[in-house]
């Protein structure tokens, strides 16, 4: 992981972020994964923050739906993405 501008950025996503790249399924899953990890670390400190917990569950659902779509459309890109993001497959 590299730090760039105070944010952690994975090496495979350092490519120039063009407008078309931001709409790709891979970029959206990457973005949701970063938000999920940030919220999970927040909830470790603030266990009774139920509104953030609800937001985390919504993000998990959105990411799960996007991953299901990608797995159905292009299995190779799906496998590559989950290995790079270090998330498990269901």
UniProtKB/Swiss-Prot annotation:
GO CC terms, sorted: chloroplast; ribonucleoprotein complex; ribosome
Location relative to the cell: Plastid, Chloroplast
TM helices/strands, residue ranges: none
UniProt keywords, alphabetically: Chloroplast, Plastid, Ribonucleoprotein, Ribosomal protein
SMART domains in alphabetical order: Ribosomal_S15
Domain of life: Eukaryota
GO biological process: translation
InterPro entries the UniProt entry points to: Ribosomal_uS15, Ribosomal_uS15_bac-type, uS15_NS1_RNA-bd_sf
Gene3D superfamilies reported in the protein's UniProt record: S15/NS1, RNA-binding
Gene Ontology terms for molecular function: structural constituent of ribosome
NCBIfam families tied to this protein: S15_bact (TIGR00952)
Family: Belongs to the universal ribosomal protein uS15 family.
Subunit structure, as described in the record: Part of the 30S ribosomal subunit.
Cross-referenced PANTHER family: RIBOSOMAL PROTEIN S15, BACTERIAL AND ORGANELLAR, SMALL RIBOSOMAL SUBUNIT PROTEIN US15M
Protein name from the UniProt record: Small ribosomal subunit protein uS15c
